[in-house]
Amino acid sequence: MKPVATTPLARERLRASPNFVLALSQDGKPYVAQETEPYAQYWLSQRYRILLSLFSGPRGATGEQAVQAYFRLTAAEPQEAERKRLLKAMADMRSAGVLIATRDDVSRYDARMAQDYLKHRPFPADLTRFLVDAAGIGPGTRVLDLAGGPGSLALQLARVTPHVSLLELSRGFVEAACAAAAAGGLELDAIHESANRLMYSDAEYDVVTLSQAIHWLDDVQVCRGITRTLAAGGSFFVIQSSMDVDDAHPLAYVIGRESILGNKDPRPFALQVQALSRRLSLLFEALDAPDVQRHDVAQRVADEAGAAARVVPAKVSFFRQRRPFDLGYARAFLSEQHIRSTGREPGPFWAEVEARCAAATPQQLEGQFDWAVLHFRRGGVPGVPADFSACGATDIAWERPSD
C-alpha cells in the first residue's frame, strides 16, 4: 500500500469511532469509506477498534496493509514486535468469529437470521402493552430502543408513537428493521451504532428501552448515556429474560441449563435480576451524584435540576411465558459463529436439530421464558422491594408467528 496523507478530520474519525473503514480503490490507493460494523467493539481496546475498522468491510485492507495504515494513523514508529502483535490480534479475531474473512462484512447476523429473529423470537405483545401503560407512551412520546436487534420491540412501539429510534450495532439487523418498518408503513429512525456510545443531546428521550442486551454492553457507559439522554420524568426500562427447558427437551443439549454453549447461572432468576438492579441503581446514584464538579456533559441534566432529577429504581415486574423452543427458535438464537465455537460445523448441526425437533411432540418442545422488567425513572423515590424472590409473576401469552 502506497503512503498516503490523511486529512485531520478523517484521522480523528478513525481514531474516535470504529464505524469508518479505510478501503482500497481500484488503483490501490486507500480512502475513508462508509460505515462498517465492528461487532467486537464491545470489548476491544481503542487500538484494536481502529485496527478492526481498517481490516474489515467489503473492500477492506489485507492484514499487512492494515498494519501499515495503523502505524500511519497512530503516528507510531513501525516495530517488528508490534507488527507481529497486530497480525496475531487479527488472526485471533478471525478464529473467534469476529472477523468472518478479509474484505467481508463482519456482521454475525445476516438477513436470514434477522427474519428468523422477528418471526421466532418476537417481543411479547403483552409486555409491550405493559411498557406503554407503565410509561404512558402516546403519540407524542419520544422513545429510544437500545440494542434493539431487528426491531422486535421498536416496531411494536412505532405503532403507538411515530417518534421511535432504534439503535443497533448489527448492520443486518438495522436493515431488517428498516425494511419491516417500510413494509408496515411505520415511522422508525434506525441508527447503526453501539449502545455504549449514546451521542445525543441532553434530555432527548422520554422513554428508553433495553431488552435482553445489557450483558453485551458496558453498563457504566450505558448508564452514563442514560443520565444524559433521559428527559425529566422519563422512564428507562431494562428487560431481562431467561429460558428454561426440561433436561428431556430435544434441544436441552443446546439451550438447557448445561449445554454445549456453557452452563447457565444457577441462581434463581429473581436473584439474578435483583443483583442487576442493585448494580444499575448504584451506578445511577454515582453518576447523578451532586456537588462533584467534572467536565462531563452527561452530568448537565442532573446537576441543574438537583436530586429530583436523579434516575432511581421505581419498580420491578416479573412475567412467565410458556412457548415452544423449536427449530425456528434455534435458528433465531444461534449464529454460525456460535455453532463453530462448539467445534461443530453448521450443516450437520442443523440437520441434527431439525431431526430432533421433527421427532418431538409439541408438548415436548415447550419450555418457559421468565421475564423481568426493571423500571428506572428520572425523579421520584425508589420503589423496588428488598427481596425480589418474594415477587409474583404474571402469565403472558405466546402468540404464534404467522407465515
Model segments located where?
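Long, charge-rich, low-complexity alpha-helical segments
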Residues: 40-105
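Conserved class I S-adenosyl-L-methionine
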Residues: 102-138, 140-147
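Class I SAM-dependent methyltransferase SAM/SAH-binding core
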Residues: 150-197
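A short acidic, Gly/Pro-enriched loop at the edge of an enzyme's catalytic core
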Residues: 199-208
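A short glycine-rich, Lys/Arg-flanked "PGG" loop and its adjoining helix->strand segment in the class I
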Residues: 221-232
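Conserved catalytic/acceptor-binding region of the Class I
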Residues: 235-320
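Conserved Class I S-adenosyl-L-methionine
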Residues: 291-401
